[in-house]
Structures are given as structure tokens and as C-alpha cells.
Regions:
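ATP-dependent adenylate-handling active sites, centered on carboxylate activation for C-N bond formation
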Residues: 2-215
């Protein structure tokens, strides 16, 4: 691992992520942004909004029964002043789309299928109801930075090995989900966190510095 100190690491992560977003904003078709209200997609949206200097178009999805994600996405959209769209789905819509999503994914992995339902229905609605044909998403951040695994990793080496494994297997899970669900609806997915310069830098950070030693999320 490289030996940059924490201040240098934070500066480089910030600059490289901004560059990763910026280079993906150029498109010959209208661009939209998937916004869950979580940190990853919110960062992508905030960088883009600042760089473009005009309201971006954000899209969020939620169930009609418990739309907690919609609440946080709405808060972020209001803060950014985006042109925000909410797609509300219900149990029947999910069940009716299940076979089609499994066919698209070509996998029986339950977690991948479950996580794909919302993305598929959201992209279907975007394709049918708007002219957006390019979508930026917050994918891959969890695999790079560890997400919940940093709370439980027994050692820094174990964390690094798990992170490397998740990156190697991305095409089987999160990338598979995003690629199939988005492209099936004739939309191009762009993933700033997957920028090669960004990924190489983050994966070279001393894993000790990635472990959750702060007792916070």
C-alpha cells in the first residue's frame, strides 16, 4: 500500500472523484442521475450540479408502502435544486416484472435479483416517460470502501482481501445488475466511482486507514 497521509488521501479522493464525474457528463443525449439519498449517489449528483451550473435531472424510486429512500432522495434533491422525479412502485409491479428481470440477469442469485427489481422498474419508467438516455449512478463505492464490512473485518489484511474479491467479482453482481437493468431500457449507464484512476488510487490506500475505527457509520 502507498503511504499517503490522511489529508493527502482525502484531497486525492475528492479530486479524482470530481474528475471521474466531470469526464462522464459529456453526452450527445440528455443526462439524468439515479439518486437514492445515500452518500454515494448524492456525491455524484452534487458534483455534477456544481460542474454543470444548472439544475440536473434526478430520479428516485420507492415502494408505495414504505418509501424511506424517497424521503432522503427528496431532501438531497431539494438541497441541490434538481429537477426531481419520483417513481412509486407496488408489490404487483415487482411480481409482474420478476420473470423478465431474472431472464435479463441470467442469474438465480437472490440478492442480485432483489436489488435489480427497483433499478429495472425505475429505468423502464425513465425510458417511457422522459428523453433521458444517459444515467450516472453511485455504483461500486461500497466495494471500494467496504460499506458495512469495515465494521466487522477482523484485520486490515482481511478487509483488503475481501475488497479485492468484491472488485474482481463485480461483473457477477452489481455491475451485472446495473448493466442489464439499465441497458435493457435503452439507456447508457455511467459510473464515476468506477473510473480507473479513482479505483487504482483507492485500492492502493493502506487498508488500516479504511477500517472503521471511529465508531461511526
Amino acid at each position: 500500500p502507498m503511504q499517503d497521509d490522511m489529508d493527502t488521501i482525502l484531497t486525492n479522493i475528492r479530486e479524482k472523484l470530481i474528475a471521474g464525474v466531470e469526464k462522464r457528463l459529456d453526452a450527445d443525449a440528455p443526462v439524468g442521475f439515479l439518486l437514492s439519498g445515500g452518500l454515494d449517489s448524492s456525491l455524484v449528483c452534487s458534483i455534477a450540479a456544481k460542474k454543470l451550473g444548472k439544475p440536473i435531472r434526478t430520479f428516485a424510486i420507492g415502494m408505495d408502502t414504505d418509501a424511506i429512500d424517497l424521503k432522503y432522495a427528496r431532501q438531497t434533491a431539494e438541497y441541490l435544486g434538481s429537477e426531481h422525479h419520483e417513481i412509486i412502485i407496488n408489490r404487483d409491479m415487482v411480481i409482474n416484472s420478476l420473470e423478465e428481470v431474472i431472464r435479463l440477469l441470467g442469474t438465480w442469485d437472490i440478492t442480485t435479483i432483489r436489488a435489480s427489481m427497483g433499478m429495472y422498474l425505475l429505468c423502464k419508467a425513465i425510458h417511457e416517460q422522459t428523453d433521458v438516455r444517459v444515467l450516472l449512478t453511485g455504483e461500486i463505492s461500497d466495494e471500494l470502501f467496504g460499506y458495512k464490512y469495515t465494521d466487522y473485518a477482523p484485520t486490515a489484511d482481511a478487509f483488503q482481501q475481501e475488497s479485492q474479491k468484491r472488485i474482481r467479482e463485480l461483473y457477477m453482481y452489481d455491475v451485472l445488475r446495473a448493466d442489464r437493468c439499465i441497458s435493457a431500457n435503452s439507456i447508457e449507464a455511467r459510473v464515476p466511482f468506477g473510473d480507473l484512476d479513482f479505483v487504482r488510487y483507492v485500492m492502493a490506500i493502506d487498508p488500516e486507514k479504511k477500517l472503521n475505527s471511529y465508531g461511526k457509520g
